[in-house]
Design a protein with these regions (language model features):
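PDZ/PDZ-like peptide-tail recognition elements
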Residues: 23-56, 92-93, 126-129, 299-347, ...
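PDZ-domain C-terminal substructure recognizer with occasional recognition of PDZ-binding tails
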Residues: 24-33, 89-133, 379-473
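Surface-exposed short loop/turn segments
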Residues: 29, 212-275, 433-441, 445
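A structural "domain/chain start" motif
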Residues: 45-50, 66, 123-184, 337-338, ...
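Second-shell loop/turn segments in exported
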Residues: 59-60, 79, 170-180, 197-198, ...
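Conserved PDZ fold ligand-binding element
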Residues: 63-83, 351-381, 387-391
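C-terminal/domain-edge helix-coil "capping" segments
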Residues: 108-112, 120-158, 278, 284-337, ...
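N-terminal segment of the mature soluble domain
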Residues: 168-227
């Protein structure tokens, strides 16, 4: 295996994005700004026709703090209707700098609701801990990676009806006694619809939900093939835990003769005023290598199926992204030219409370010495190369940024990994970003991290209590 195919976004690569602005634009920009949302222009009549739809919101980002939600339709920006703006003009306002942006957004439970979006900006020559965690991701891919998972769903919609004025929903055949499985499915769907802003009202529903499911033997199953197969499982997103779980499902596109069972589950949404009109549907056809609980499948899969209501992006085999971003936060901004140089400390942050100030020089963290950027980068690459034996081959994946052969740590090697990280030659000072993991710092007698800082010629040790920031989210890719 060639190391160049394995390496993550290294610090040197990351710093290229903070280089000379003059080389990138005719008007130099001294700041880089973060908003924390993704959007797509809608070109269907069901939801937000010819307006931007918010697709994802990064937790703890300016977009999240503004109260924006996935599925919001952007009606206006800084007082200008999106009907009068091109997409390019919309983007230029979003990327206009650090000035507050006024948005009006609509969803099921509100119309033209005002939201104030305040971009988070800092000098291009600085790095915060969120970006540092990306640069040093291979210390803990379990906490810093993005993966795409494809689902075997087929989604359809009626093309002309607007869903924007729907307010209430109910379930079909509510007068009949329901099985425990039916009740479980309805509960998952109800939770999803209520989170989108719809209300349950069996007396006057705008839409009516119907479900069906089967678990049957696969008539094309080839036991001999299955016995000789290398892999009879896949991973799926657990939407409750925002993590990946191993399941006895075949990956999309795998040989279906390896599956002993076929599970089919469907959701249909009908017009509550005319039940003959099917507005939206999604069907999952899953090939299983062993029996699996219908209720557990519903818990794992219905949130992903309902992720395309009301705005359909994929008709078949939708791709979901699980973005895992967890790191220790102290509130430091460091200079890209010298990562020991503290440029800014966020007020009331753990670092500020511990007494770290701007213009302090970090000498060491947890007794691991600081070094120059090129030294840190070389030592990090060496660490990645020399610890391949501790990676779990069964967890191999390609990160969303294109890095191949990514693998999580082997759980039976945590002690060995911790010993490697502790070696002086690896200059693993920034492993503190993932210090909440047992394979980083091992057993500790104190929750504090030690920061040795040089101030006015005197080195002093300060104890910092970091905060765990979890900015993980799930979105259609």
């Amino acid at each position: 295996m060639k190391l160049k195919h394995l390496l993550p976004l290294t610090l040197a690569t990351l710093l290229l994005g903070f280089g000379s602005a003059e080389a990138q634009t005719s008007k130099p920009k001294s700041q880089i700004c973060r908003i924390g949302l993704e959007y797509q222009m809608s070109y269907n009549e069901n939801w937000g026709a010819n307006r931007p739809i918010i697709l994802s919101i990064e937790p703890n980002s300016p977009a999240a703090l503004a109260g924006l939600k996935v599925g919001d339709i952007v009606e206006s920006i800084n007082g200008r209707s999106l009907k009068d703006l091109s997409e390019q003009e919309f983007v230029e306002i979003l990327q206009g700098g650090d000035a507050a942006i006024q948005l009006e957004v609509s969803n099921f439970s509100y119309k033209k609701k005002s939201r104030t979006l305040q971009p988070e900006c800092h000098d291009r020559s600085l790095l915060d801990e969120r970006l540092l965690a990306q640069a040093f991701a291979f210390y803990s891919l379990e906490d810093e990676s993005e993966r795409a998972i494809v689902y075997p769903f087929d989604t359809g919609r009626e093309g002309k009806t607007s869903f924007e004025n729907f307010g209430n929903f109910a379930f079909a055949d509510e007068s009949k006694a329901l099985s425990s499985t039916d009740i479980a499915l309805n509960e998952v769907i109800r939770k999803q619809l209520e989170a989108k802003g719809l209300r349950y009202d069996a007396s006057d529903p705008d839409i009516v939900i119907d479900t069906y499911y089967t678990l049957a033997r696969n008539p094309y199953f080839d036991a001999k093939k299955a016995k000789n197969a290398d892999k009879l499982w896949d991973v799926r997103i657990d939407p409750d835990q925002k993590s990946l779980v191993q399941v006895p499902f075949l990956a999309v596109g795998a040989d279906k003769q390896l599956a002993d069972y076929v599970l089919t589950m469907g959701i249909r949404i009908f017009n509550g005023r005319n039940l003959s009109i099917l507005l939206w549907s999604c069907e999952a056809v899953e090939h299983l290598t062993e029996e699996f609980s219908i209720e557990e499948y519903a818990r794992l899969s219905i949130p992903m199926m309902m992720g395309q209501f009301p705005f359909v992006r994929y008709n078949i085999n939708p791709k979901w992204r699980i973005a895992t971003h967890r790191h220790n936060y102290t509130g430091l901004y460091l200079r890209t030219s010298d990562l020991g140089d503290v440029a800014y400390v966020v007020p009331n942050s753990p670092a500020a409370k511990a007494g770290i100030r701007a213009n302090d020089v970090i000498v060491a963290i947890n007794e691991k010495p600081m070094a120059m950027v090129d030294q840190l980068n070389a030592a990090y690459r060496l660490f990645v190369e020399n610890t391949l034996q501790y990676r779990d081959e069964s967890t191999m994946f390609t990160n969303r940024n294109g890095v191949k052969y990514c693998r999580y740590w082997r759980k039976d090697s945590y002690s060995s990994i911790q010993k490697q990280i502790a070696k002086e030659k690896y200059l693993s000072i920034f492993s503190y970003l993932f210090g909440f993991r047992p394979y980083i710092l091992g057993e500790r007698s104190t929750p504090y991290y030690t920061f040795d800082v040089l101030r006015e010629g005197v080195t002093q040790r300060l104890n910092v209590m970091p905060e765990l920031h979890d900015n993980s989210y799930i979105t259609l890719d």
